[in-house]
Amino acid sequence: MTKRKSALSALKPTKKQVISSEDSDPEVVVVTNPPLDSPDAEESFISITEEDEAVRQLSTFDFSAKNTKVVRDETRGRSRVFHGMKFKETIVLRGAYVVTVWSGVIHINGALVNINSPVDIPVFAPASHALPQIEAAAGAPETRESGDEDVMEALHQLEGSSVIVEIAAMPRRSENPLITVSNFGKMSSGNIVPFVRQLWHCSEDDGSNYSRIYNTASVVTKSQAAVIPGIYDEWAEVCDDIRRLKHSSTMVVGSQNTGKSTFCKYLSAFMTTKKTGTSVAFVDLDPSNCEFTAPGQVSVTVIGAGHLSPYSILGPSFTHVTAPTYSRFVGYNNPKDDTRGYIEACKAVIDFAKGLKLPLVFNTCGWVRAAGHDLLRQLIDHVKPSDVVFTRDPGVDADQARLAESVKARSHVLDAPDAEPPRFTGAEQHSLQTVTYLHGGNLASHLSDLPALEVGLESVYVGILDSEGVDLADVALSTNSTLLAVMTMDKKTVKHAEITPDGLQYLPNFDIPQGECLGQAMVQFAGASVRLHTPVSASLLNAQLAADKAIVLVRGRIPLPVYELWDSRKGGEQAYVSFDVNSGVGSEAWVARRGLKRK
């Protein structure tokens, strides 16, 4: 097999033009990235690596001058790349990019995208998760209109293709409401979270070229073989079967890393994009791998018409953290730590979701054996689903079979797509989700530099889960510089509050939170006020206070990454860390103000 050239050539920025080739030059592929000092380095396009067998298997689209047209756009300061795809052809890219359909229909992660869909739909394909597959589908041949003559000329040259799609790099900064990550350039730099530098590399050895990490997406190589099909036939059949029910209620059950959350997003996108105006309620009952919130919560999020767009969830959970419709705080990453509290929180969320009168999609936790089997049985009895989808795991097939026999619902058993072992540990993924949440999706600044809410101590109450034996004098020490849930409760639940020596209104022996969770915050007590680093808005808190609700800050056991407390660029005295330097070699130590010494 003859290898194709690695790129066409660098585009000249002097004038706008449609670039193509004669039919006699079929080996030419797309374009290179501009030099780092070029004006085009701000926002470039797709680069193509040399072909190997893995590209053939995953990306069946054959990049050539016949099916790829490049338009130089001076107004946008970049080049635009259009691809004409045949029916069932696929493109798999690694990186972060935006997609616009100009003609026909494509599927991405179960979502149907056509000319009536938004432009610049964001797709996040990091190394930590299975890669989305763009697949050309059957659809009407209408073409999206453009006032740009050169764009229309490029579309004309691609006539005869089943689909014409434009793929561009994710912009560093964007006002696109579908892009919940507000500053992708900083997010991909490891500016705050050290290990995210590994997320967007186009290959294992190009990490030194920073610009290519966020300015390019690359065709996958042999080392990235985990793929989410654009329209997986087995999954699509189950999704279509569920969609036809008027009031479907679907629970997805399986052990960890078998594709539960992936299928839940797939089903939600399938249902809400297959028919215009459809909404679903995504009920997340997995406090460890939360889809839309920080870890430690169970929640309901409405996806679809007038709510969260299904086109904004085409990526891992940390790329679309958002405020849920309703949430309860569990306080632990693992339901094993407090099964009673977990069940109570789940039941409250389930009851709220049922009241929405929408199709329901339930993502469950990965605890399916022993006591976890009984816990799932309780949840299924409370939900009374129309369908239960089991993601196959040979190690727990017997447990799933027993559960399937006992449920009064339609059962479906799915094989998960082939996947590689997770690149990051569970703890690292929890950290990434937590940090992205606290920063509101913007990692351009350290958390201590972002504006915080300041609330008087008289307006808040403090509780600590499983706090038996905590002395009143130690409450501030136990909660300062930690991650606390921000909850709203009826005032009658806080009548037994006690005042600590620091002036905090403390709820002793705090058990199960019986109120809505508005979000989470890193807390710092400062004199007569408390400072909250949180994406929860001041207007929301003021509305709760105006409604005569109590604001309760609850500490569970959700870890906070230490790099959220310490900005290594500053040194010296900081808001959450103090430095004490004594004489002698090795005597320097830093002390977090929560009272934990680290040498």
From Swiss-Prot:
InterPro entries: Clp1/Grc3, CLP1_P, P-loop_NTPase. One of its GO terms (cellular component) is nucleolus. The keyword rRNA processing applies. Residues 1-24 are annotated as: Disordered. It is an enzyme of class 2 (transferase). GO terms for biological process: cleavage in ITS2 between 5.8S rRNA and LSU-rRNA of tricistronic rRNA transcript (SSU-rRNA, 5.8S rRNA, LSU-rRNA); rRNA processing. Pfam families: CLP1_P (PF16575). ATP binds at G254, S255, Q256, N257, T258, G259, K260, S261. Keywords: ATP-binding, Kinase, Nucleotide-binding, Nucleus, rRNA processing, Transferase. Its EC number is 2.7.1.-. The keyword Kinase applies. It is found in: Nucleus, Nucleolus. GO terms for molecular function: ATP binding; polynucleotide 5'-hydroxyl-kinase activity. Polynucleotide 5'-kinase involved in rRNA processing. Belongs to the Clp1 family. NOL9/GRC3 subfamily. This is Polynucleotide 5'-hydroxyl-kinase GRC3. It comes from Yarrowia lipolytica (strain CLIB 122 / E 150) (Yeast).
